[in-house]
Amino acid sequence: MCGIVGIAGVMPVNQSIYDALTVLQHRGQDAAGIITIDANNCFRLRKANGLVSDVFEARHMQRLQGNMGIGHVRYPTAGSSSASEAQPFYVNSPYGITLAHNGNLTNAHELRKKLFEEKRRHINTTSDSEILLNIFASELDNFRHYPLEADNIFAAIAATNRLIRGAYACVAMIIGHGMVAFRDPNGIRPLVLGKRDIDENRTEYMVASESVALDTLGFDFLRDVAPGEAIYITEEGQLFTRQCADNPVSNPCLFEYVYFARPDSFIDKISVYSARVNMGTKLGEKIAREWEDLDIDVVIPIPETSCDIALEIARILGKPYRQGFVKNRYVGRTFIMPGQQLRRKSVRRKLNANRAEFRDKNVLLVDDSIVRGTTSEQIIEMAREAGAKKVYLASAAPEIRFPNVYGIDMPSATELIAHGREVDEIRQIIGADGLIFQDLNDLIDAVRAENPDIQQFECSVFNGVYVTKDVDQGYLDFLDTLRNDDAKAVQRQNEVENLEMHNEG
């Protein structure tokens, strides 16, 4: 999962992009990058592994000159976690193009082969984002005149959409032209558009993964970029938009609302906060029906995503809500941390139990989801160590039984605790006295209540239905060989830093 931002401004954008990336940091903590276009029409790039605050020092910010730029925060879902695979990526032909991408291409392997054999384009990393950039560049290269018209750029994006499959929200810059952004025909990954009027004659535009980035910088939210839609903002600040997909349909990722997005964001006209409150209502009602005989003394969230959900469950059940865990905010999210051993070590550094809320009580813990089960098992153990008599666990999401192929790092089915297991078996493994999951239909209803115009969601991790209709068991097996924890351990041992000559080190 990644976060992207792009600003076409009339004033220097380096600080604004930095600030936007800090509020999108929850979408990826592995690497960060910013690239701008300076007054000489040259790219200025800084990218490296680490948090936004670690990657960009004052000397880097001073070099990132220009009124137009894009930024990216990354967690690696395709390729390795080497600094050379941090984004944005760059190609020098045609014109000079740079691109940042959130998502995952499901036909990256065949596209890499096509680019080399047919287009003579070499891909130097294992990142599908570099492949996507080169596909787009190759399509732009079909137009031999300069400068390109908006029609030409939209035609290149339409051709790109026909070639690539999967999930993608992208922002790019083309030297001598401006900034472009586009979203996949299923709208799986989020992308929003905003503007800020500087004065009567000057307007700045911004695209980002979540609306909270617009809010932070004082941009007015215009709308979500539609599935299959492309945005083009010229160097002069003129805005063009066009539908560039043949059969666009809205299939936003349901897991965005459960886990990834910030609660103060709106995605596809849905308040993430309100959706989570609705999840709490649905799950609370199910608990009241199915666990009416349980003696629950207190409802405690596993912070932070589940806090709003747990508060609503407590209201439905008529039980006290307490903050039983204190969170160290300087430790990354555990299920998107590379490697199972790192995740296990991280949980106890991340959370500490407040014994006063657990001692001699039957506690209902609430989490947003259960992925590998690593966190759940250790937190239940911590609750017992803190003196809880019984520990029940409620998940705001249904059982995650299938790999994700659209940009979330949980692809290996064998690493999912719910894969091939029933609820009671999962309960025994994690050591809970009781375990309950949200029903998928209830989860969909909870989110869709905020925008009834959305007819369906991308729910593959719950039901195994992949909306791009190109994912088979062979592809899932291929991903497993690349992305399971053992494979990633080998990748980390073999990685060699390659910062690239144009990187502002």
Curated annotation (Swiss-Prot):
In the C-terminal section; belongs to the purine/pyrimidine phosphoribosyltransferase family. It comes from Escherichia coli (strain K12). Its EC number is 2.4.2.14. The lineage of its organism: Bacteria, Pseudomonadati, Pseudomonadota, Gammaproteobacteria, Enterobacterales. Catalyzes the formation of phosphoribosylamine from phosphoribosylpyrophosphate (PRPP) and glutamine. Can also use NH(3) in place of glutamine. Homotetramer. Mg(2+) binds at residues 305, 367-368. GO terms for molecular function: amidophosphoribosyltransferase activity; glycosyltransferase activity; guanosine tetraphosphate binding; identical protein binding; magnesium ion binding. Residues 2-236 form the Glutamine amidotransferase type-2 domain. Pathway: Purine metabolism; IMP biosynthesis via de novo pathway; N(1)-(5-phospho-D-ribosyl)glycinamide from 5-phospho-alpha-D-ribose 1-diphosphate: step 1/2. Pfam families: GATase_6, Pribosyltran. GO terms for biological process: 'de novo' IMP biosynthetic process; glutamine metabolic process; purine nucleobase biosynthetic process; purine nucleotide biosynthetic process. The active site is at 2 (nucleophile). Inhibited by iodoacetamide and by the glutamine analogs chloroketone and DON. The gene is purF. Binds 1 Mg(2+) ion per subunit. Its cofactor is Mg(2+). InterPro entries: GATase_2_dom (IPR017932), Ntn_hydrolases_N (IPR029055), PRibTrfase_dom (IPR000836), PRTase-like (IPR029057), PurF (IPR005854), PurF_N (IPR035584). It catalyses: 5-phospho-beta-D-ribosylamine + L-glutamate + diphosphate = 5-phospho-alpha-D-ribose 1-diphosphate + L-glutamine + H2O. Keywords: Glutamine amidotransferase, Glycosyltransferase, Magnesium, Metal-binding, Purine biosynthesis, Transferase. This is Amidophosphoribosyltransferase. GO terms for cellular component: cytoplasm; cytosol.
